[in-house]
Amino acid sequence: SIDVKDKSLYMTTVTADNVLEGKLIGDWLIKQVDGKPCNVVELQGTVGASVAIDRKKGFAEAIASAPNIKIIRSQSGDFTRSKGKEVMESFIKAENNGKNICMVYAHNDDMVIGAIQAIKEAGLKPGKDILTGSIDGVPDIYKAMIDGEANASVELTPNMAGPAFDALEKFKKDGTMPEKLTITKSILYLPDTAKEELEKKKNMGY
């Protein structure tokens, strides 16, 4: 995201709460493991990107209350499938062929989709032997959930333009000034609604 200090330069901004997105995955994991020890490997986004910083922060804040959950390795996968796969391969090799890993948390779905491939190639079952949690809600993550290979994703709404255009139309119509900041909803999706969400994405042109 772009940080503009002079707020007079824009009418409104529509954005997601990236810290909350990370927190929702952390909260889900706490419930999922129910007090059992869980070693997490983290696939970070692009180094220095505010989205990556915030998603890391939110997850870390959530699991701070759960001493049974530890991040044992964390490295940038640069928000790509290929890099996510490559880094996950190194995590698996470093952690007893993945046997020491309970969950992979990725700052976006693409990296976790790459990680899923690495997990399978190591002879493990993604979604079972190694849990997955990620952010964005892209169609392929719902496909992975349907296949039993992914566990949780927080949707980054694809409709950010909607509220922005609504604000612009109101301003043009009667001069109504919108709020400076509109935060879109962050929703955690699990396999039980994956088919439904995938159909919605198809209808939106994904």
Task: Describe the role of every protein-language-model region.
Residues 1-20, 31, 39, 138-146, ...:
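Flexible loop/hinge segments that line or gate small-molecule binding clefts
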Residues 28-36, 62-66, 87-95, 118-122, ...:
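Structured segments of extracytoplasmic/periplasmic soluble domains
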Residues 1, 13-15, 39-44, 72-74, ...:
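Structural recognition of the beta-strand scaffold that forms the well-ordered cores
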Residues 3-6, 20, 35, 46-50, ...:
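Solvent-exposed loop/turn segments at secondary-structure junctions
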Residues 43-51, 62-63, 156, 160-206:
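Hinge/cleft segment of the Venus flytrap/periplasmic-binding protein
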Residues 21-25, 50-69, 83-88, 114-118:
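Short, solvent-exposed amphipathic alpha-helices that sit
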Residues 59, 73, 77-143:
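Hydrophobic alpha-helical
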Residues 39-42, 63-81:
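Short beta-strand elements in bilobed, periplasmic/extracellular small-molecule ligand-binding domains
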